Amino acid sequence: VHLTADEKAAVTALWGKVDVEDVGGEALGRLLVVYPWTQRFFDSFGDLSTPAAVMGNAKVKAHGKKVLNAFSEGMAHLDNLKGTFAKLSELHCDKLHVDPENFRLLGNVLVCVLAHHFGKEFTPQVQAAYQKVVAGVATALAHKYH
């Protein structure tokens, strides 16, 4: 991902304030509610029948935290996202058969959740930098599909 020094500083500073459990659970939950076809990858998670069920689901929250912990690894290695996400790309491609478009959708949902959590602190400049990061992560996760 090609970030300016200011962009890198902005995303890193904000990421240091992120509660991965809270934001991760909300981001994955919103993905499953807003794009319900993504639920097919989580049929072992139990009740996903209503938005309230999804947002209150302990397995969704736990997996959302796991997703954001992996994203944190990417934030620590912004210059090597393909390497950082190589094993996860392989897992999602070869074993889980996840549509790589879902990575882009989740990235966009994550940006919405960050805006919701950080309000005025999530300026248009910070959003632009995060859009670059989530696009880079989505590309890295889709790498094994090509």
Swiss-Prot record:
Tissue specificity of this protein: Red blood cells.
Entry's Gene Ontology BP terms: hydrogen peroxide catabolic process
InterPro entries for the chain: Globin, Globin-like_sf, Globin/Proto, Hemoglobin_b, Hemoglobin_oxygen_transport
Source species: Cephalopachus bancanus
Modified residues (Phosphothreonine): T12
Domain Globin, residue spans: 2-146
Modified residues (N-acetylvaline): V1
This protein's GO CC annotations: blood microparticle; haptoglobin-hemoglobin complex; hemoglobin complex
Gene3D superfamilies attached to this UniProt entry: Globins
Phosphoserine PTM positions: S44
Keyword annotations from UniProtKB, A to Z: Acetylation, Heme, Iron, Metal-binding, Oxygen transport, Phosphoprotein, S-nitrosylation, Transport
Family per similarity comment: Belongs to the globin family.
Binding of heme b, residues: H63, H92
Single GO MF annotation: peroxidase activity
Pfam families (UniProt xref): Globin (PF00042)
Subunit structure: Heterotetramer of two alpha chains and two beta chains.
Cystines in this chain: none
Listed SUPFAM superfamilies: Globin-like
Task performed by this protein: Involved in oxygen transport from the lung to the various peripheral tissues.
Residues with S-nitrosocysteine modification: C93
Modified sites of kind N6-acetyllysine: K59, K82, K144
Protein name: Hemoglobin subunit beta
